[in-house]
């Protein structure tokens, strides 16, 4: 089920359960997961994209292993707030994912998540090669953490 807003997503989730954050690129999918209480996002891995069915099988293996309760997809919105082809591609991925899982799916504005990930890795003094290996799932971690912080805020406001 695709949830248009974070309020809808929060309502569709069970009280506890890990979430998966995805940073969808043309060649890779960065994957991050939260703890079951949804406080901390941890970058997990990068899936090298092949075709949708193989990518999804790989992703669903992680979903089963980690007992994922919902998905947060990074939505690549332009700096002016408009949506371009990459955002449309992300929405199409969500529609295809929705056909294959009952888990709730929402979007999180991913503007500057890759920049933040790069900056954090530069500060950690990682080599260029290592940064290239990690950037996608580290960016997924930034995306998921933003959504987790919003969910925590909503929980405090409603509760």
From Swiss-Prot:
Q: Which InterPro entries match?
A: RNaseH-like_sf, YqgF, YqgF/RNaseH-like_dom, YqgF/RNaseH-like_dom_sf
Give the UniProt entry's GO cellular component terms. cytosol
The record's GO molecular-function terms, alphabetically, read: nuclease activity
Q: What is its EC number?
A: 3.1.-.-
Question: Nuclease: is it a keyword of this entry?
Answer: yes
Keywords assigned: Cytoplasm, Hydrolase, Nuclease, Ribosome biogenesis
Q: Name one Pfam family in it.
A: RuvX
Q: Where in the cell is it found?
A: Cytoplasm
Highest rank taxon of the organism:
Bacteria
GO BP terms: rRNA 5'-end processing
Function, as annotated, reads: Could be a nuclease involved in processing of the 5'-end of pre-16S rRNA.
The record's NCBIfam families line, in alphabetical order, gives:
RNAse_H_YqgF
Q: Which PANTHER family match?
A: POLYNUCLEOTIDYL TRANSFERASE, RIBONUCLEASE H-LIKE SUPERFAMILY PROTEIN
**Membership in a protein family:** Belongs to the YqgF nuclease family.
Q: What is this protein's name?
A: Putative pre-16S rRNA nuclease
Q: Quick one: which gene encodes this?
A: yqgF
